[in-house]
Amino acid sequence: SVLEIGLMLQEETEKNPKTSYSI
C-alpha cells in the first residue's frame, strides 16, 4: 500500500539522511 511504502521510505531516509525520496 502507499502508506507502507511511505513508512519504508521514511525509515530509509532516517538511516541515510543524504538520500531523499519524493512521491
Swiss-Prot record:
Tissues in which the UniProt entry reports expression: Expressed by the venom gland.
Gene Ontology cellular component terms for the protein in this record: extracellular region
MF (Gene Ontology): toxin activity
Keyword Cytoplasm recorded: no
Protein modification: Contains 7 disulfide bonds.
Main localization, broad class: secreted
Record's subcellular location: Secreted
Region (Disordered) location: 1-23
Coiled coil ranges: none
Keywords, ordered alphabetically: Disulfide bond, Secreted, Toxin
Family of this protein: Belongs to the phospholipase A2 family. Group II subfamily.
Protein name, entry field: Basic phospholipase A2 homolog Vur-S49 analog
Organism the protein comes from: Vipera renardi
Lineage: Eukaryota, Metazoa, Chordata, Craniata, Vertebrata
